[in-house]
Amino acid sequence: MKCKKLISGIVAIMLVAVLAFGSTAAAVGAQADNGADLALASQNVSELTATTDSSASSRADSLDDINEAISVIKVILGAFSSSDKLTWDSFKTGVSRLFYMSVDKLIDSLVVGLSKVFPLMSRPDEADYKFTNSNVGSKSFNDKAADGARWNVGYSSATLLTGNELDGNHYVGGSLSYPNPKHPTEILDDLRVRVFAMSDGTDNGIVVYAVLDAYGLAAKDVREIRSRIAGFIKNKNIVSVNISTLHQHSAIDTLGLNGDLNKVLFGNTFKNAVGMDPSTLHNGQNKEYMEHLYKTTADTIVAAVNNMEPGEMYFSQTDVHEYIRDKRDPQTFDPNLNRLCFVPDNRESKPTWIVNAAIHCVGLGAGTTSVSGDYPYFIEKQVNAAGANYVQIQGAELAITSQTAPVAVEGHTRYQTAEAYGNKLGEILVAADKGSRVEPILNIAHRDVFVTVDNHALEFIASTGLLANEAVKAKYVSMRIPTEIGYMEIGTNLAF
């Protein structure tokens, strides 16, 4: 028994080292095509979340791996049949893919082996899990504006900082850090929550979006925020409360991923081995900070709803492709700053700009210990100076990040470059035309779903207690995550 525990510990340390020095956190988003059909979206959700036989799934995965390897080898061999530069580039790309495939399989094998001997936290069965504080969505989907329909929008914002972030009990998001944890060392600007509430003036209900300057947020934390204002949500006919983050790598860790890996490796292992309550496990969340986040976000949602007023909505797209890059070829990304501009009837009130863009907030580097809102902080300053409120919704980013070459100055720090980058995008937004009028039509639908975790590294990390996400055991797979998916239509040709 002692020998088994010793082996487990050695393998665990190896894994922590591999993960700490070879991994960075990534976020994946998805956007629906404009005018997408709700029924098709629902069908895709059903297919995504359907439970499949584990052996069949395993065979399919193996075949996919084999086919991918064969395709890569073909590319490499094909490069020798021509001296064409494009083919040579394909050869180098193929070699890189083969290398990363091999490393990925090595890490995956280590994690699978470790999971068999490492004491992991217990999970409830999927059948016993109950979703709470769910979004209900619109009672009907309308394809034209109702008689007398008008856009009504409200805005509010508040700081998420408590003043205690440098006390040594908080962690910074971004890349994993081992053996030394990433405690914040300086506060460079602000981390905020920005909220807008909107309706089309009908009884179809109010939709709320709260966007946090944060590394990430688990679904259970989203539902906790909703629970704080459950009565208000019901009384105000709020049919959807959406809470997302801008995924700043320089924000306080609200997802849990960047906790002290030594405490996870040793402390959580012991607690899991003796069956202690999972709530006692260590992760990167600071309880006082999270409580402040819950309360502040809930209060800001209430304020935004109470600030709603009638006006007109406009939509514009501004091409900023020279300021965006994909870190992985081919270069594929949305080149636009997609803006909804609400202009209130009351000219004494400020317009509200809602901007969707897919640009990673990693200006200070993935390993920074400085706290900053990154480039969105500086965009907001430009927009505020022009007399408007600002909310940014992060798009499908993953490896898509900022192209700072046009604004970079030799000798500047990364923070100064992030400032210049944000200022530039802000200036472009301020100069943009307000766009075309959007009909007052607002439809939204939601579904609670379970998503299978097929990344063994993430599965293992979650099972140590490092992540704040809830997870359940399923019949044919070892872990599924309870989450939710939504689909929204604005006007006659916009969908999110």
Please give the residue ranges for each predicted region:
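N-terminal, intrinsically disordered, polar/charged segments of Gram-positive cell-envelope systems
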Residues: 35-54, 75
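Conserved beta-alpha junction segments in alpha/beta enzyme cores
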Residues: 61-244, 248-420, 433, 440-496
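Sec-dependent N-terminal signal peptides of Gram-positive bacterial secreted proteins and lipoproteins
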Residues: 7-25
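Anionic-ligand-binding alpha/beta catalytic cores of soluble enzymes and soluble regulatory domains
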Residues: 425
